[in-house]
Amino acid sequence: MSTGRWRAVPLAVRCVVAVAVLVFAYGTGVHVVQLLLPQFGPQLALPGWLTVYFASLTLWDPLAAVLLAARRVEGLVLGCVVLATDAAANGYATYVLDPASGVTPGRIGQAVITALAVGFVAFTPWLAPWFIGSGGRSGTTAQTPRRS
């Protein structure tokens, strides 16, 4: 992320995006493992729609990572949607479907995903000016950031 399309982008922005790309890559790995090896998946009987949603993350997580790495504003939007819906889906599975009480690994994981979602949504307005806009010419930034 230090050459090419990222050359003029501040180091802080590159670091935040790199962490986000790693989060989505990790999420991809987790969801692929859970899909291929069910013994590592949730130990609950999930409704069909929730199972389909979690399986779909094997597509949406890597797509968000690729779009973010390519500096596409669509990656920011998709990243926000994926993390927010993943936090909500895990919240439903953890607090509605799981009869366990107290602190559980599922609740810790759900809290982490929620924190990531809140953080990514909060950083998005700061990151957006450095991303390539979807409207207009390819290769142009959404707006020219002002140096202060």
Where in this protein do the model-derived segments appear?
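Topology signature of small-to-medium multi-pass alpha-helical membrane proteins
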Residues: M1-S148
